[in-house]
Amino acid sequence: MNEIISEIKELHRKRVDFHRTEKATTLRIKAVCRRLCDGDKTEAEKLYKALDSLNHPQALYAADYVEPMRQAKNVLEVERKKCEKQAGKLAKQLPVWSWVEGVRGVGPLALAQIIGEAGDLGNYPNPAKLWKRMGLAVINGERQRKVSGAAALEHGYSPERRSIMFVIGDSIIKCGGYYADLYRARKQIEETKLPEGTKAHHHNRAKRYMEKKLLRDLWAAWKATNKENVETEKVEA
């Protein structure tokens, strides 16, 4: 299993690098459009959207200008999707997949992303350590977040890791199921506890609670399924 985890981690890093470069290339293309529109953001957005239809006075020149960038972006997208497909296939080979596939809203790529960032979940002595790794811990009575100075080391916060859980949480809420129900129940509790809070505040607190519960259950399932796997191997031996 260690080899599978190592492969997933490497594919995840490649995927992240490709995705970052994709986004940077898109931003560069948009920057070119803004320059051609003398900094007019509204007009630049129209030009950007017209790069295919050429339905803009400057579209022909702009499209020719950024074509190499767009080609590079397409190559990056293809390679990123290859990494995602390979990582997802490997994630299905992990013993814990038998548990994860029953969780609505969490697919093989989501599992691969968590493992890509956290590694072997069996190395975490408790769920709290995993929460911190994925940006969901409580540090000195406050939620883990991006801070500066000496506190940054203690928080150990990574926006990328937190983003993974944020996206997974969104997917779960949309797909329904046990964890979506848990989110809705917790949201009602938050509304009662903090009647002066905003809807966004209640939503975020309930979603964070649900994401932490998911990680805690994933950690427990990892321990259980890997123990079963080891015992099966002993019997077969």
Where would I find each of the regions flagged by the language model?
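Long, charge-rich intrinsically disordered scaffolds of nucleic-acid metabolism proteins
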Residues: 1-91
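Short, hydrophobic alpha-helix immediately C-terminal to the catalytic nucleophile
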Residues: 5, 112-113
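A residue-level signal for conserved active-site and pocket-lining positions in enzyme catalytic cores
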Residues: 18, 165, 214
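Glycine-rich phosphate/ribose-binding loops and adjacent secondary-structure elements
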Residues: 89, 96-97
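Phosphate-backbone recognition surface of nucleic-acid-processing proteins
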Residues: 99, 113-203, 221
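Transmembrane alpha-helical segments and their cytosolic interface motifs
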Residues: 100-104
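Small-residue hinge/turn detector
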Residues: 107-108, 130
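Basic, amphipathic alpha-helical segments enriched in Lys/Arg and hydrophobic/aromatic residues
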Residues: 197-232
